[in-house]
Amino acid sequence: MFPPVQDLYRIAPEIVLCLFGMLIMLIDPFIPAGRQRAMGWLAFVGTLGAFASLRWMFMNPGSAYSGLLRADTFSLFVHGIVIAVAALAILGSFDYLDHEGIQRGEYYALILFATAGMGILAGANELVTAFVGLEISSISTYILAGFRRNALKSN
């Protein structure tokens, strides 16, 4: 049985972020090494899509999934901040990744997954949901912290 459409509207930003993250991971192996910056632009478009989907969340306030998540003005505000910061982080990392020679698509996918986890954490109405959001964002952040394998600071 599928959840009601209102529940899907209330988690629309997370759905958009995860779909773009999976799309980047599926497309990335087929992109030539010199064109990896396109994955960053695709991730940026994903953050714009998630930001645009906040409208659906705003139009359908209330709880979702039997009270596990809550879509209200506070979670909408936090979602907006988190998605905007992720978009700025993606834009700011283009030249850095080129300079370090580690321009790979999974970097951008991990940023999108971490952003989705923070969004779940922002809308959590139960402790279990908060833990799931925290784990999704923290695992992605741990992987991002060790992304530069050859640097001593990442080890």
Residue ranges, per PLM feature:
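Alpha-helical transmembrane segments of multi-pass membrane proteins predominantly involved
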Residues: 1-155
